[in-house]
Amino acid sequence: MVAVLFIVFLVALAIGVPVAFSLGLASVAYMLGAHIQMINFAQYFFKGLDSFTLLCIPGFTFAGNLMNQGGISDKLLDFADALVGHVTGGLAYANVLASMVFAGISGTALSDTVALGGVEIPMMVNQGYDVPFSVAITAASSCLGPIIPPSVPMIMAATMTGLSVSKMFMAGIVPGLLLGFGMCATCYILSVKRHYPKRNTPPKWSHIWHATKEAIWALIMVGIILFGIMGGIVTPTEASIICVVYGLFVSVFIYRKMGPKEMYSCLKDTVSSASAIMALVAFANVFAFILTKEHIPSMIADAMLHLTTNKYLILLLINLFLIFVGMFMETIAAILILFPTLLAVATAVGVDPIHFGIIVVMNLVLGLCTPPVGVCLFAATNIGARYGKCTLSDSVKALVPLLIVNFGVLFLVTYVPFLTVGVANLVMG
């Protein structure tokens, strides 16, 4: 019956059925064939959603939508440009810096690409950067969204396996910063080599002060999330609700751009995004129940450990496997299906679960800007095509140097656990 489970799942995916419903169809087919009472389906479906931690997903999503409704994208980019726009490749740095700050609000990569890309790409093109490079840095920097907390993929990984969401958030900060600095260094080298323009006038303190005042409300929200969780003052779910109240206050009373129409749009986008994730979680929990019942995770773990028990080789094999998976499968779906199984392998060779969670999230998130199914790359390319010639192949070529650096950071994080759990333990104990 295991064969039926995987055949139905793969066939459903092949004909275009969404991943969540493919998991559900495969689970139903297995249960009917194995004569398992369907009450088990309902029980495990509900059990997958019965989590206080999962409440922070609609919370962070709604808070990000509220802030974005107030035009936070423009304000963040102006703030970043005021700080670094006067140096060589300054707008590229500003692109990365804005993504790093926006990551602390949204928690997803695609929202970063769409919200910031519509502002960043035309601004870069107008100042003399070529379109493919503008698209590439926008797509690559958007991957910081799910790595710098709050992070929806990290919430999924922690919830599925009983790990601490707060600790995983803290463990993602340094890898996110390393990715950002690595991309900035790459931008500098490429900007010097290609003679990209820079702003001739140094920044004026009045300009920096004005840009900071405009962006300060977004920066405060990032502080609420990071320091509230890091200090043990609030849980991630409580932080998300505080951010919703804060975002509502800022949008209505500070930015004054929140009317009934805008509120409806924010609620609609939030419900659409959060419900898709919740459905995926529920169906994946039923699928995971079946895999556990058939001892699939332990069989895979035993098979890998028969190949080698060397921790470093195991991590290398898992990295290569996840890089491949990330090129074809949506991040959250891959985490829900694969993470519990691979975690059993990693812990068997002595890898810290939090450290391994960051490795898995980084691998799969980087797949968001790699073909053939890189949704962030496609979204950024579509935006760039409005402002000049830019095909998908042009974007991929421009993306290669950034991907090399990003994967280099991935392997550094993989083999230096202090960058993740070491920092998290120092901060949270």
Predicted regions and their residues:
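Alpha-helical transmembrane segments of multi-pass membrane transport proteins
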Residues: 1-429
